[in-house]
Amino acid sequence: MPSLLDIRRRIRAVKSTQQITKAMKMVAASRLRRAQERIQQARPFATEMLRVLNSLATRVDPGSHPLLDERREPRAGGKVLLFVITADRGLCGSFNTNAIKAASTFIVENPGREVALGLVGRRGRDYFARRGFDVRYEQVNLFQALQYGHAQRIAQAAVEAFTNGDVDSVYLVYNEFRSVMSQRIVVERLLPIPRLDFEPPSLVSPKPGSEAAGGGGPQNAGTTPQIDYLYEPTPEELFTTLIPRHVEVQVYRALLESNAAFYAAQMTAMDSASRNAAEMIDGLTLYMNKVRQAAITREIIEVVSGAGAL
């Protein structure tokens, strides 16, 4: 049976750990708020860029850019570059484990393809490097000061590998932030870029209730004209310029999502650790009181027994 001194020492150690986990939870909560704000600021830009690209796609040759070459979709025996985004630290629940498992599953489910890896984050790098995988790109200490330039470097490495013919496709594996309690693993193709809306859009959109909208009304009940953009320079030049930027934006979005998901997972893990520490302190305190009560009772019995012997 441990002594009272040992129990008090354990209680002090658990309380010290609880203070650390509470502080880490507060720091993660603060950084999560900033990460959420950055996601909200980036989404309108990504949405408008996609809108412009969809408009440009109706005015140019769909095969005019090599990053749209669907014929380079990975085939049996083809080569894939898989970017895996993890964190540099632990204490974040299953954040790193889920990304690593998703990447490992992707590799196992594509036995006919040669998979090279681009590793973002120390945890993923350490895991795959120890197992002898073909690592083409690595970057660590990214979430500490995440900038758009980080996404540009990753996108540049992906585009160069794809356009040089080193790989047939590029995929991203990352944690998507949905809420503080929920993060979802995403495995999505980055290159070749999934085909945009190349169908020429109608210059008018049917109003709700019209026959074209499925409302059963007259066919020409009313229409709302769509905006037809005038481009300067030419649509072809803009399309060629914006396609690589679109790749950068998608990578940046994945980094922002992972950044927010990491802090959400860390905040949840530290909150759980703090609550577990509180329960452990309560249990140790109760046990300490029982041990002390037993010691007092034993001493009383010894005193009474000694008095009876006299």
List each model region and its residues.
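C-terminal beta-strand-loop-alpha-helix "lid" module of Rossmann-like NAD(P)-dependent dehydrogenases
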Residues: 1-310
